[in-house]
Design a protein with these regions (language model features):
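Noncatalytic scaffold domains of N-terminal-nucleophile
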Residues: 1-2, 6-170, 175-177, 181-183
């Protein structure tokens, strides 16, 4: 509707899904894109993260990597970088005209103003409630009173809205090198 191209739409959709389907995708995950131009040239964007710089190469006290939680993360989140690289490709080679901030604005609104919780989100949070209740960040947003939001209940994520606003204002690299990186 605003004259953007398919890559710009994919970035905006990905940002919105990070708000509305956090059980399937998110800013803290990996991201991948295959982009074909009008002449059939295909570009690949890989947002597969590397191991964090501060992760010890080997810790003899760790016998098993936990299934969930901060210690289970073995790579740096690559999704935001993939979105940023896709934006740059769109501008450089595909005539992209949308601003980075405009692509994140719908996701900011969803996170700030809320959206109806989905059946899929309810199923997975309910199914994993025991595990998720042990993660204070997840529990504070998605498990009020220890229970998953009901299907259709309005869910707001003000901290995620702030993160998305910061990305919109400062650019995708802030997630890795700026204010957001220092908070992570």
């Amino acid at each position: 509707k605003s004259g953007g191209n398919a890559v710009e739409a994919a970035i905006a959709i990905g940002a919105c899904l990070s708000v509305t389907y956090p059980h399937c995708t998110g800013l803290g995950g990996d991201g991948f894109m295959l982009v074909a131009d009008a002449h059939g040239k295909v570009s690949t964007i890989s947002g597969i993260g590397q191991a964090p710089r501060r992760l010890p190469a080997f810790d003899a006290s760790v016998n098993v990597i936990p299934h969930r939680g901060p210690v289970s993360m073995l790579t740096t989140a690559g999704n935001v970088d993939a979105m940023g690289k896709a934006f740059e490709l769109s501008r450089r080679e595909l005539g992209g005209r949308q601003s980075w901030a405009s692509l994140l604005t719908p996701a900011v609104a969803l996170a700030r103003d809320g959206f109806p919780w989905t059946a899929s989100g309810h199923f997975w949070l309910d199914f994993r409630a025991g595990e998720m209740n042990r993660l204070p960040g997840v529990a504070s947003v998605f498990l009020a009173n220890g229970k998953a939001p009901a299907v259709g209940e309005i869910v707001r994520q003000p901290h995620l809205a702030h993160t998305l606003e910061t990305l919109a204002e400062r650019g995708h690299r802030d997630f890795y090198e700026g204010h957001l990186a220092s908070r992570l």
